[in-house]
Amino acid sequence: NDIYPDSRSRLPLRSGPYQTSVTALYGRMASPGGLGPGQIRAYGDGMQTLEARVGTRLVMLAILVTARAHDSQYEWTMYQPRALESGLELHVIDVIQYDRPIDGLNEKDAALIGFARELFGDYNVFSGTYVRALAAFGQTDLVDIVALMGAHAADAAVLAAFDQRLPEGVEPLLSF
């Protein structure tokens, strides 16, 4: 069991000061003892510095795997060319797009894709998958990668709810 008794999550309870405005955002909404998303986000350094820490290629990978998990044509089509420009290889993009096995990918790519597939497909991340992603990215970067994926999942929900179409003349790039 990898759950800490004090926080009731995979990260131990932590007292402030926080790197982000966690208290202002989540202080009223947190359950007793400061549990909840703000407590977890406090382990990150913030999405504004994530790209500098992990590189554009991995940021694009996180965005694409999230777009694919939500079948978000808009997000996929807007980000897939940027992912290629950032150095994300076409064979890795194909693994995401066509839900192919992650065997043979480098460790960070495989860990991130496996993590996201469980998170968005099973609505849970199993202990072994979590440990693999933690080893690949470290605690701070993993928290911020999940925050990035969460932000893009929220975007996918908004785009789907309001049936956002691609810009005029832009061909869809996500096929199933």
Spans of model-derived segments:
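Histidine/lysine/aspartate-rich catalytic loop segments that bind and position anionic ligands
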Residues: 80-106
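Acidic/histidine-rich alpha-helical segments that form the ligand environment
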Residues: 106-146
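Acidic, carboxylate-rich catalytic segments that either coordinate divalent cations
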Residues: 132-134, 141, 150, 154-176
